[in-house]
Structure formats: C-alpha cells, structure tokens
Amino acid sequence: MKKIFLLAALACTVMFADAQNLIVGSYNIRNDNQGDARKGDGWATRYKILCDQVQWYGFDVFGAQEVKKNQLDDMLREMPEYASVGVGRDDGKEKGEFSPVFYKKERFKLLDSGTFWISPTPEKVGVKGWDAALPRICSYVRLQDKVTKVKFWFFNLHMDHVGVEARREGAKLIIKQVLEMCGKEPAIVTGDFNVDQNNEAYHTMLQGGVMKDSYEAAAEKFATNGTFNSFNADLHTQSRIDHIFVTNSLEVTNYAVLTDGYWTPTTQPAPEIKGNAAPQEISFRKHIHRCPSDHYPIAARLVLKK
C-alpha cells in the first residue's frame, strides 16, 4: 500500500512539474495572397507544413500575425487541440488581418480576453495610430492552468512596418497596458515588432525593467539565424524582428529560432542523380528548399511559478 501511495505521489509531482513548464511562441504566418502563390509560396502549399511544425514543437500558447479569416479557419481545422482569440483589425470582427492568440484547450481555462488598437485611442476600432500606415492591434488572453491554477496574461501584436513613431509609442502603450491590466500576475508579449534588437522601439519595451527579452534571458538558446527570411532559406541575418518579452517573475530556460523548411519539386521533372559519397542505393532529385513563412517562428520555454 505504501508503494502505491509513493508512486501516486511521484506521478503527481511529475505532472505538477510539467504543468509549471510553458512553451510559448510567436509566428508571423504571412498573409494569404496571390503574389506568393505565383512564386510557389502560397498559403495552400504551406499551411499544413506550418501547422505540423507548431504541433511538433508543442506550443502551449502562441501568437500569430498576418492572419486572415480563411487562414485562421484553416489553422483551427488542422490543429483542433487549440482555441483562439482575436478579431480583424479593420472592423473588430472578421475584416482585415488578425493577431490571434492560440492556446491548448485541455490545459488552460480562458478567464478574460480582448483586443485593443495600437493608437492613442486603444478602444477605438480600426484606427491608425500616430504615423502608422495601417491599423494595428494587440489581442490578449488571461489564462489559468487547470492543474497548477496559476494565472497569467498573454498579449500578441503586429507593429507597423512604416511608422517609426507608431512603433515607439506603441511599445509605450503595451507596457502601460501590461502594468494596468496584469497587476502582479505574469505576462508574456509576443509579436512581429518590425524592428530588431538594435532599434529604439525594442529598447522601449525594456525600459523600466517591466519586461525582459526571452532571447537575452534564456539559460540556453538555439538561434542560428534571425527571424525574417523573405521566403529564401539561403538568406542569413542577425536581426530579430519577432520577439517574446516576459515579465520578471517568469524564468526563461530555453529560446530558439525554428528554421525548419520543406521541399517542393522543380517545375520541370528533375532526373535522378547519385551522390559521390552516398551509398549507391540512394537516389536524389533536385527540389526547391522552401520556408513555411517569410518569418521563422520563435519559441521560448518558460517556468510558471506559483
């Protein structure tokens, strides 16, 4: 009987330890458009690969950017273990790109959610903030782990690609919202910030010590490239324009830029070839190396402390 109780206690301890670990991510999935499709990088070609990638890495919660309604529907169909929260940026419903938060339904209870616009009037739908070229939004959730009962907030955004002031003031707005909304509860902010780690807006996110960059805070990191690839797997950059910021109560154990790719046949059928150093039983054909999006997803493993 003592052995049974001991095994049960050990099992509970392992379950609790696993529940304290949280894998989060950010993924600009690139909007669905015909220009990409004509080059072989269309959404229909890549979305199943993209969803398989998310599932393989086991994101517990992640933010996505540039998501149109049809893309959101495709992702939820391919990944039924996730629920999502978010609205279209143009009308606060389904028009325009979403910046949704996805979370695992079985693990988390949704306590609160919403969207605000990155502008001087965050509650006003569809507005452009400061010098932004487009309306920009931040969607958020407040979740509770069903096992540990720990509560935390998750914000996801896409900053403007043109407006310098909009990015700087937008970063100030995000910090203000985190302070006002979250209190002492942990908070995570993910997104395509459209600026790298050397930019003023990036450093604005770190001012006051409210948040830290998971890349810098990680005990271990695997990041052999930056986060933007322009649909070209041969390109390399030091710039990280996609970020995961966390409040100080969250421990960051690991961080990674996920550079997985896939291959499609060439337009003309390629002949079989043999590799000089390969076993002769192996044949190769020329294929095109592609990326699931024009951004690489990023991931961080966090520890949620009670």
Range-by-range predicted roles:
Residues 16-78, 90-97, 172, 290, ...:
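N-terminal, active-site-proximal structural segment of metallo-dependent hydrolase catalytic domains
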Residues 1-21:
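Bacterial Sec-dependent N-terminal signal peptides
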Residues 62-65, 86-87, 188-192, 213-216:
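Active-site neighborhood of phospho(di)ester-bond hydrolases with catalytic His/Asp-centered motifs
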Residues 31-40, 111, 164, 222-225:
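Short, solvent-exposed loop/turn elements at domain surfaces
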Residues 165, 176-187, 195-306:
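Metal-dependent phosphoester-hydrolase catalytic domains
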Residues 22, 60-61, 152, 186-188, ...:
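Short, Asp-centered acidic motifs that coordinate Mg2+ and/or phosphate
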Residues 61-155, 159, 254-259:
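Structured beta-strand-rich core segments of catalytic domains in phosphoester-bond hydrolases
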Residues 27-29, 157-159, 192-193, 296:
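Active-site metal-binding loops of divalent metal-dependent hydrolases
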